Amino acid sequence: MKSLSMLIKPASSNCNLRCTYCFYYDICNNREIKSFGMMKLNLLETIVKRAFNEAEQNCTFAFQGGEPTLVGIDFYREFINFVKKYNTRNINVFYSIQTNGTTINEDWAKFFKENNFLVGISLDGTKEIHDKYRLDANKKGSFNKIMTNIKILNRYKVEYNILTVVNKNTSRHIDKIYKFFKKQDFRFLQFIPCLDPINDPRESHPYSLNPKDYETFLNKLFDLWFKDFLDGRFVSIRYFDDLLSILLGNNPKSCCMNGFCSCEFVIESDGSVYPCDFYVLDEYKIGYIEEKTFSELFNSNVTKNFIDSSLNHDVKCKNCNWYPLCRSGCRRNKEPNFPNGTNDNIFCESFKSFFEKNISKLTYVAKTLAYRQH
């Protein structure tokens, strides 16, 4: 494999927070074993060894959870030792970790900096907005702790971005959220739509994001972002970055904008492997990393069926003027009906409205960026 990326869950579904809308909590409650416990070091070594046996040019290790820091910092120190041991061909290696930010201290910050980790911090906005759903086991908010720890990251000059879940509440306060992020000088942002539990009817929870709210959110966020762009302050917002990449003839970074699913090689703490973080379910298990190579896992029938099923887009979808930008969106946003029944993305009308309103401005930004690069 020229490039190999994997998503490792060293603490399985274990987490020190109890976020109301957590999609992985829902996932683990829909499989036979909710938590596989903490990953053993011999399994971690196997993962690293297999990765460098197969990666030819680039290798990316992403850590998520649950809360991946719960496994302890020594686990990651050993991980770096394994990388040094097995990367005998000196291929390019990239590290990232997605954390709720509550456990970060000076040791973690120093480690991230020394080893060039890109850190994703989950933060939903101001204290009032964030603490509505991102609570600990005692139902207390996590905002204050996270903001304190972000200051530690800043002090060590750790590279990080902010990940915000767009739920009903955050979608209606994007002006306040964006203003707050701007005040904190957060320049790299991701906004991901909140997912309803996989077997529940759409929009059946207080936090559920409906298409109209998402449409309003996208339009307001774009207006704020575009104004900053005109004022000479470019903020990286993952979704807008991907749209600009497509307009400039490049590939988006987000898998949901490719028009088909890929295999993310999600590795749970027991070594079981799955094609996607949204489908770490028993029926989507590809196999075990201790028993199969990455190539064998990729060529399995489960992986093939998962990818092939994502290629079935409605004719009306393919004929839509905005298909080249939308590309049908994330498969998970077509549940619970996908792959049988309707194939509509729940946010189809949201995207249509957004593109119709903002395509000329998006094109202007793309052309401006292209001009600056020459």
Curated annotation (Swiss-Prot):
It comes from the Bacteria. The keyword Cell membrane does not apply. [4Fe-4S] cluster 1 binds at residues 15, 19, 22. Its cofactor is [4Fe-4S] cluster. The active site is at 277 (proton acceptor). [4Fe-4S] cluster 2 binds at residues 255, 261, 276, 330. S-adenosyl-L-methionine binds at residues 21, 66, 122, 134, 195. Keywords: 4Fe-4S, Iron, Iron-sulfur, Metal-binding, Oxidoreductase, S-adenosyl-L-methionine. The keyword 4Fe-4S applies. GO terms for molecular function: 4 iron, 4 sulfur cluster binding; metal ion binding; oxidoreductase activity. Residues 1-227 form the Radical SAM core domain. Binds 3 [4Fe-4S] clusters. The first cluster is coordinated with 3 cysteines and an exchangeable S-adenosyl-L-methionine. Its EC number is 1.8.98.7. [4Fe-4S] cluster 3 binds at residues 317, 320, 326, 348. Signal peptide: none annotated. Pathway: Protein modification; sulfatase oxidation. It catalyses: L-cysteinyl-[sulfatase] + S-adenosyl-L-methionine + H2O = 3-oxo-L-alanyl-[sulfatase] + hydrogen sulfide + 5'-deoxyadenosine + L-methionine + 2 H(+). It is an enzyme of class 1 (oxidoreductase). Belongs to the radical SAM superfamily. Anaerobic sulfatase-maturating enzyme family. Involved in 'Cys-type' sulfatase maturation under anaerobic conditions. Catalyzes the post-translational modification of cysteine into 3-oxoalanine (also known as C(alpha)-formylglycine (FGly)), by a free radical chemical mechanism initiated via the reductive cleavage of S-adenosyl-L-methionine (SAM). This is Cysteine-type anaerobic sulfatase-maturating enzyme. It comes from Clostridium novyi (strain NT).
